[in-house]
Regions:
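Terminal-region recognition feature
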Residues: 1-177
Length: 177
């Protein structure tokens, strides 16, 4: 019985959520089957990412995470679904946290919605901070700095090991497949 792969490749959006969700439903029928979540993503929707995190967290199957390439923004939260000793990254991968921004998807911004959007962002920050605190060795100060003040905080593989973000750095992905 081989390992089942769940890919989080590319942007985190509704399509990614649906893809992961259908795979999770399928895997609930075989809770003994090992799952590898392969991540190479620059992030995307915080809401969809938290949904993916929640789906994977309740999946009873044993989980491993492989960061191969970029793991940025909300993808970093998804990467924390497995126990630290089951989280891996390749040497050439990056892990980066950044501060959120107000959505500016349209040319003119309706400022009457700013308070609602800021309140929503603060709620998301609290949820993200709680996950980083419980799943890594990052200090509250470092998390606050990354989420609220820095435009981008990049972690090398060495720092990921030291801070409990990953448990092992792989020379080759063959080491886990």
């Amino acid at each position: 019985m081989g390992k089942e792969i769940i890919n989080v490749i590319g942007p985190v959006n509704e399509k990614t959520f649906l893809s992961v969700g259908s795979k999770v439903l399928e895997l609930t029928k075989t809770p003994e089957k090992e799952v590898i979540v392969v991540i190479s993503s620059n992030g995307g929707s915080v809401t969809m990412g938290l949904g993916i995190y929640d789906l994977l967290k309740v999946l009873p199957n044993p989980k491993e995470v492989l960061i191969c390439g970029s793991c940025i923004s909300i993808a970093t939260i998804i990467a924390l679904v497995a126990p630290v000793e089951k989280r891996y990254m390749t040497k050439n991968s990056i892990f980066a946290i950044h501060s959120s921004s107000v959505s500016g998807d349209h040319m003119s911004f309706d400022y009457s919605h700013l308070n609602t959007e800021l309140s929503f962002m603060n709620g998301n920050h609290a949820r993200l901070k709680k996950i980083y605190l419980s799943e890594t060795k990052l200090s509250e100060k470092k998390i606050d700095k990354a989420l609220f003040y820095d435009s981008l905080t990049i972690f090398s593989y060495e720092k990921c090991l030291k801070k409990g973000i990953v448990g092992k750095v792989l020379e080759s992905t063959c080491d886990i497949f």
